[in-house]
Amino acid sequence: MCIRDRYKQVYSPDHPVPYAELLNEQTEPVMRELHERGVKCAIASSSYRELIDELVEIAGIADVLDYTISGHECSAFKPDPEIYLRAMEALGVEPAECLVIEDSPLGIEAGKRSGARVLALRPHEGVNLDQSRADAVIDNLTDILAAL
């Protein structure tokens, strides 16, 4: 049994993560607005597939997503751009047409290396991440709508 499976079996049941409480409240309305505007949307996350699917369900955005991919389904992790390039291919779009929303330095680098424009979502107060390589830093998910 791998460490992740053992963790889920032993630790997780007694220590659930309150994802619904941690979810950015702007996620669903912004994703719905993007969908209404005809913007193709994907989630390209380094998280495990099970967690991505769980968070998509909690956020209530499965019906407005065109594609999801886990870093564990790729041959290389961020900062390698593979995850973004595969998402772009699945959506049938070119890198220059894409806007990547990231927070981590490795994700920002992966997005830049894919050829997309990258917006960095400023982290919560007290979290210090180097987001200097992003094309711009945004404070709220609603700022995405103005960036299109």
Q: What is the predicted role of each segment?
A:
Residues 42-43, 120:
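Hydrophobic beta-strand core positions in alpha/beta domains
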Residues 4-28, 37:
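Metal-dependent phosphoesterase signature
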Residues 1-2, 98:
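Disulfide-bonded cysteines in secreted/extracellular proteins and peptides
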Residues 18-20, 40-41, 72, 96:
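A generic structural signal for short
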Residues 3, 7-8, 40, 78, ...:
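A general lysine-centric signal
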Residues 32-35, 49, 53-148:
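Asp-based, Mg2+/Mn2+-dependent phosphohydrolase catalytic module
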Residues 1, 21, 75:
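Flexible, active-site-adjacent loop/turn segments at secondary-structure boundaries
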Residues 45-47:
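Conserved phosphate-coupling serine/threonine residues in phosphotransfer and NTP-handling enzymes
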